[in-house]
């Protein structure tokens, strides 16, 4: 199945996830207390960044997951929810978060697509069953506005994800290397 692309509707999902927040601050008697359900149903006007990594307990993946947490307030300021997903189960996510210093306090849920339905529907499921390293920016109408898939050895750049989100939310023509606050392209003025 080909990767869903710009203009396609993002598939509906309901996934079990490890709750956001500092795991040390959560009062829980058992691992299940650390789990929640995340879905594609979001408040009106909300954008989403849904990013996938191939596998827990690897090397590049935790650097990306932590990096997506760093600009959390920037995403919130843009009315954008962030959800991280892999095909590992929620117990594996929980164990990884507990054991990795940079993952213990994440401001977004780590979701499990254990049955691989979402991964497959998006066209990012590998023959080995893992998800590709993929990022989707989804507008408030549930339409994919940006897709990026990178090699396992290459981590993503969250500043670039924010830049793309700014450009998409500007609803203007934005030149290469455009940054929020910079002038956009006046196509009508150029056609003159």
Describe the predicted segments one by one:
Residues 1-192:
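Chalcogenol-based redox active-site neighborhoods
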């Amino acid at each position: 199945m080909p990767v869903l692309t710009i203009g396609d509707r993002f598939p509906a999902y309901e996934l079990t996830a490890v709750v956001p927040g500092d795991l040390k601050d959560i009062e829980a008697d058992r691992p299940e207390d650390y789990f929640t359900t995340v879905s594609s149903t979001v408040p009106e006007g909300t954008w989403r960044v849904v990013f996938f990594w191939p596998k827990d307990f690897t090397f590049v993946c935790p650097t990306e997951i932590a990096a997506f947490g760093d600009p959390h307030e920037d995403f919130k300021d843009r009315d954008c929810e962030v959800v991280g997903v892999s095909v590992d189960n929620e117990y594996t996510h929980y164990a990884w978060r507990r054991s990795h210093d940079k993952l213990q306090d994440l401001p977004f849920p780590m979701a499990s697509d254990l049955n691989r339905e979402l991964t497959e529907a998006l066209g990012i499921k590998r023959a080995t069953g893992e998800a590709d390293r993929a990022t989707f920016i989804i507008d408030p109408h549930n339409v994919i506005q940006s897709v990026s898939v990178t090699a396992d050895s290459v981590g993503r750049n969250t500043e670039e994800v924010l830049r793309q989100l700014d450009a998409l939310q500007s609803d203007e023509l934005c030149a290469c290397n455009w940054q929020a606050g910079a002038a956009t392209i006046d196509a009508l003025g150029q056609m003159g």
